[in-house]
Swiss-Prot record:
Domain of life from the UniProt record: Bacteria
Protein species of origin: Heliobacterium modesticaldum (strain ATCC 51547 / Ice1)
GO biological process per UniProt: translation
Cited Gene3D superfamilies: Ribosomal protein L30, ferredoxin-like fold domain
Gene behind the chain: rpmD
Name of protein: Large ribosomal subunit protein uL30
Disulfide pairings: none
Keyword Ribonucleoprotein: yes
NCBIfam families: rpmD_bact (TIGR01308)
InterPro entries linked: Ribo_uL30_ferredoxin-like_sf, Ribosomal_uL30_bac-type, Ribosomal_uL30_CS, Ribosomal_uL30_ferredoxin-like
Record's keyword terms, sorted: Ribonucleoprotein, Ribosomal protein
């Protein structure tokens, strides 16, 4: 089965660089404490690495 990543936005991006705010938006997160599911790809992993201090990540079997 394919692994998916559950990404939850847990800390505000206010005061952080613009590229980090854009990365949060690109991940599909619009509000704090919102969660989204994404396929586990290198591109998504790179975005998570950019904002790892703002989000939490869980691996989910889909």
């Amino acid at each position: 089965m394919a692994t998916k990543l559950k990404i939850t936005w847990v800390k505000s991006a206010i005061g952080y660089a613009k590229n980090q705010k854009l990365t949060v938006a690109t991940l599909g997160l619009k509000k704090l404490h919102q969660s989204v599911l994404h396929d586990d790809t290198p591109a998504i992993r790179g975005m998570i690495r950019t904002v790892n201090h703002l989000v939490t990540v869980e691996e989910v079997e889909a």
